[in-house]
Every structure is written in structure tokens, then in C-alpha cells.
């Protein structure tokens, strides 16, 4: 997992991007998390629970949680395959290492560095209580410094796809709500979910639990990763160059764990399409995503469209984005 330091863009707020690359060992952890029974539940009703989220000045959506009885602020991040806890909070939350009986790896390699897998005896999010929940400890120092820079609450960790998919979560980016299924036996969709006026965009889920949607940039077919952990929509520098789209330099740069600092430019996209939703005159960040999106997805292959960048929180909020992890659908207006 990689986290960029704060980089102001056009509105002078900060964004923090957590870029994730997972080795085979980490992928094994994701498979274990997806297949494992999802712990115990604090109460049988309601079968679904809508939790209010707090939007940080870095444009992240935060939910209040309790880890082993201690309060925590966790970022809800659709771009994170696994849930993580800040390394410097491991002792505070009394997280324990994995055991041989658990059949989980003790460490996973993420972008060339090893991170420990630990167990939270109890992770409570609203009425949902997960017992003996595996999480990865990661240095979130970049995020911590970003929070201090804008004088706001530091985050304790991240809720990733390993929790969002099994609970068939619905994340409403505009209304700032996280809806979780607290009873895994309940069938059917989230009640009271109004889709009127919204357009459905199918989500493709990769083997390492990243979410992609089809779209286009100035008419050129491209895929975008749906990433609420990215403050703004960001396009890959090489893709923008191939499209001969003009960019302008900024004084800002982005750094990430185990990667060199990278400059950030800004481009004006004439037409950005996500599914059947067209966005005209869209200003986006431009950054080198090499090493952050892997498996050759940044380059077109076998006639398929490349991954051009990240569909970030600012765009999702402005266009009433709703991510339905149960049906694997993104709704936009």
C-alpha cells in the first residue's frame, strides 16, 4: 500500500492517495478474507444499517468504528483491496499477530516492503461486529502529516474491499452514507435505495479486488479504477501524452511509500465518459501511475482499453456516485 503526501490541486485542498500493489502472498490473504465467515453480529436487527460518514478536508469519507473496544476513525476506500490499521496504532488497539492455526500469512509484500498481518479480536462498525478480523498494518505517516497540515483528525486505518464486498455494502458518496448488511442470511437488495435519475455502470472486479469501469477520454476508450481514496480524478501521464492533451505545470508533487516523489500536472479534458455518463470540461490531475497500477494494465493489450487513471472522490461526489458492492454496480448522475 502506497500513500502520497498531500498535494493541493486547483481548489487548494489536499488529496492523499493510497496506491496498492499486492504480491501473491497478499492476494492469498484477500482470498482468505473473501472466503472466510464474517464473524459474529452485535444484533440481528436491523438487517441493514446506514452509517453516517464524515467528509474530511482531504475529501475522504470517514466512519466511526471500535477496535477491541477503542474508538477509531477509518477511511472507507474502494481502492483498497484489504483493510489496514496504522502501524503506530498497533499497540494502542492491542492487535495480535496471526497464528499457524489461522492459515493466514504472517506478512505480505506490498510494493517491495513487507507488512505484518495482525488480528483484531473485535472490529465493530455500527451494529456489525467482526470477530478475529485479519488486517494489515501499514505506515500511514503520509496521511498523518496531511491531516496535521489541514488541522484535522488523523485516521487510524482503512476499510477495504475485504469488508465491503462480504457485507454487500452500498457507499453513497454524495449523501455520505455507508449501508452495511448486518445479517449475511438476508437476501435481496438494500431497502429504500432510490435509483431514479441515476445511470448504472457495471463494475469489473479484478483478481486483486480493484474496481474498474469502462469509459473514455475525449472519445478514446479507457478504463478507470473507482477509488474513493483518491481526492480527485487522476489520469496516467503517459496516457495523456499519447492523447496529446495539453497540461500545465503545478508547484506540487506527490510522494508515496517505496516510490520516488512525482510531480503533479493538471489537464482540462473536453469529454470524460464513465459508462453512459458524459462529463464535459473536466479538470483532472495528471501523474505517473507506473508502479501503482500493475500487471500491464496501463498499456492497451489484446485490443482492450488501458487503465487510464483513477475515478476519484471529487467526481464521485459531484455526480451523486453510489457504489453497490453487492451488485457490483456504480450509479452516477
Question: Would you name each region that the model predicts?
Answer:
Residues 1-17:
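N-terminal secretory signal peptides that target proteins for export/translocation
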Residues 1-3, 30, 39:
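Residue-level detector of alpha-helical transmembrane segments in integral membrane proteins
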Residues 8, 20-21, 92:
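Sequence-pattern detector for short linear motifs
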